[in-house]
Amino acid sequence: MAWNKVYITRDNGQRAEAQAPIIVSASRSTDIPAFYADWFFKRLNVGYSAWTNPFNGVRSFVSYENTRFIVFWSKNPRPLLDHLDELKSNGRNINCYIQYTLNDYEREGLEKGVPPLANRIDTFKRLVDKLGPGHVIWRFDPMILTDRIVVDDLLKKVENIGDQLKGYTDKLVFSYADIAAYKKVKANLQSNGVNYHEWCEGEMVQFASALSSLNKKWNYVLATCGEKINIEQFGIVHNKCVDDDLIIRLAYNDKILMDFLGARIENVGFWVPENSFEVAPGVVAVKSKKNKDSGQRPFCGCISSKDIGEYNTCPHQCEYCYANASKNAALSNWRRHQENPFSETITGI
């Protein structure tokens, strides 16, 4: 999407053109909340950050002058607890929600850099207490099959976490690990000695059916991320991870944001407008435009946002990582960031 352009004054005093997104994604490419929260909120206060295009290496600038909403993505968003109040300070009116990937691969050691599961569940609950219901979405992503993990193992892992999150979230998003489609993932798993197993359609259906049965005690919205397979017969829908409907529900009082999304907010009495959905008691939204991001994968439902992260910068060291070419590349960039932690770039250079 072509965002509006503004001019910024860089740290070195130079003037530069920058795109000024209304919705920011932080980030699909790295774990900003876990490792770069201090950097991000510093750059938010400065007013801009630099971003390098992963396809052509061209550096550009992102201004936060027009930002009204942030979608955070993380496996360990605990550092956000110290910063969330800044979204509403210094004249800002920025709302957010968190896509919280809360997996359990502790026994198998697939996510060596994340905190213990109990700590991550505690963080989830603290964030909900801070932000309110609907602001923290549970992701178990990806669902991986290996010589040590079968479908029943995954279901037990999901059930354990799902039981503990009841009352703290209303949604579970998941995906089946499609390893063959991602060369980096395949290479990382093979180099780390993980004997993975590709999902077949029968296993996908088996998992979906059993998950649907488990969900009778939770009543979560179940959704897949970027999946071609249709399993709606089990009450599982295709997700929008950057979700205009959720953004509208959480920030319907923000007229600038609603105008951008093409959402008209109405108080209702006996008559309810056609094709509307409830955002609060007695308040509905009617959308007049489709906001799907054409730059995402074919089966991705996300709306347009500006991602500000960069690949090869996440030190979680997950064995199946799609965002790092190698562990060494990520650690090298992380060390470089620590030498210059508030640089305009996430890598410190």
Regions found by a protein language model. Give the residues of each.
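Local cysteine-cluster metal-coordination motifs and their immediate loop/turn environment
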Residues: R297-S326
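Surface-exposed cleft-lining segments at the edges of enzyme active sites
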Residues: E106-V114, P142-D152, Q190-W199
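A C-terminal junction/extension of Radical SAM enzymes
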Residues: G202-P298
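Conserved Radical SAM active-site core
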Residues: M1-E111, L117-P133, A325-I349
